[in-house]
Amino acid sequence: MAIEGSANMIGYGLAAIGPGVGIGLIFAAYISGVARQPEAQSRLQAIAILGFALAEALAIIGIALAFVL
């Protein structure tokens, strides 16, 4: 039983790498966009925060499933 629980947590840890990389790419693109066009900062910020929330939701769903299963 304990081995199954540990395997679930290891699986979640590996699965969390994807959203982590995705969030990094989202904010890298945001910073690059603001550096190119500072006047579009407010519009780009809203899009970046929405992208962050969607990517983070994947990680939250993953940890919920790791605890349930």
UniProtKB/Swiss-Prot annotation:
PROSITE patterns: ATPASE_C
Cellular compartment(s): Cell membrane
Signal sequence residues: none
Gene Ontology molecular function terms on file: lipid binding; proton-transporting ATP synthase activity, rotational mechanism
Site feature location: Reversibly protonated during proton transport: 56
UniProt KW keywords: ATP synthesis, Cell membrane, CF(0), Hydrogen ion transport, Ion transport, Lipid-binding, Membrane, Transmembrane, Transmembrane helix, Transport
Membrane topology according to the record: Multi-pass membrane protein
Gene3D superfamilies the record matches: F1F0 ATP synthase subunit C (1.20.20.10)
GO cellular component: plasma membrane; proton-transporting ATP synthase complex; proton-transporting two-sector ATPase complex, proton-transporting domain
PANTHER family found in the cross-reference section: ATP SYNTHASE LIPID-BINDING PROTEIN, MITOCHONDRIAL, ATPASE PROTEIN 9
Chain's role: F(1)F(0) ATP synthase produces ATP from ADP in the presence of a proton or sodium gradient. F-type ATPases consist of two structural domains, F(1) containing the extramembraneous catalytic core and F(0) containing the membrane proton channel, linked together by a central stalk and a peripheral stalk. During catalysis, ATP synthesis in the catalytic domain of F(1) is coupled via a rotary mechanism of the central stalk subunits to proton translocation.
Family per similarity comment: Belongs to the ATPase C chain family.
Subunit structure: F-type ATPases have 2 components, F(1) - the catalytic core - and F(0) - the membrane proton channel. F(1) has five subunits: alpha(3), beta(3), gamma(1), delta(1), epsilon(1). F(0) has three main subunits: a(1), b(2) and c(10-14). The alpha and beta chains form an alternating ring which encloses part of the gamma chain. F(1) is attached to F(0) by a central stalk formed by the gamma and epsilon chains, while a peripheral stalk is formed by the delta and b chains.
This protein's name: ATP synthase subunit c
Native organism: Nocardioides sp. (strain ATCC BAA-499 / JS614)
